[in-house]
Amino acid sequence: MKQLLFCIFLLLLEGCSSNQPPAVSGQIDELPTIYPDYIDVTIPQSIAPLNFAVQTEGKACAVFTTEGYAFTVYASNGAFSIPDTDWEKLLTAAKGKQVEVSVLTEEKGKWNAFLPFHIRVSEDPIDPYIAYRLIDPGYQLWNEMGIYQRELSSFDPVSYTHLRA
């Protein structure tokens, strides 16, 4: 009986959660100020999610749309953390096309929408890794340095060499 009640509770939670964008009350006639600035860039199809932040005091919402696929991400502090699986599906559907990103912010219980921006998704493949040297900004007197490789589809770094003076 407890298992049945638990299953019903989970179904109710699933039914109450929504991936739909909120109803828009007002329009802001400018592009959102986001960091990092991904407005009108071209990206490879296999890149990791491009998380970003928008300046807001309250809740924020980003709607990612392309032909055949769309999803919504909410942020309580303005920092969007895009789920890997949704991002991969989006880029697969948008290969050779563009993704429209609509950012909404909540003020006094009303949702306002900025002008949407676009991210183009290239059909061309890229190398899966990038190698780089990481040193402190004052490199003339370095005391620590490393050679790293980063996978571009997940941004996971691997250290090859870590040197100390």
Language-model-detected regions and their locations in the chain:
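Contiguous beta-strand segments within globular domains
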Residues: 37-56
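Surface-exposed loop/turn elements that mediate protein-protein interactions on large endomembrane-trafficking
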Residues: 149-160
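Conserved small/polar residues in nucleotide/adenosyl-binding loops
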Residues: 161-165
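Low-complexity, Pro/Ser/Thr- and charge-rich linker/hinge segments at domain boundaries
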Residues: 34, 113-139
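Structural motif
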Residues: 140-149
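Short, aromatic- and glycine-rich surface loops/edge beta-strands on solvent-exposed regions
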Residues: 95-107
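Signal that preferentially marks extracellular ectodomain short beta-strand elements
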Residues: 79-95
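C-terminal motif of bacterial Sec signal peptides marking the signal peptidase cleavage site
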Residues: 14-15
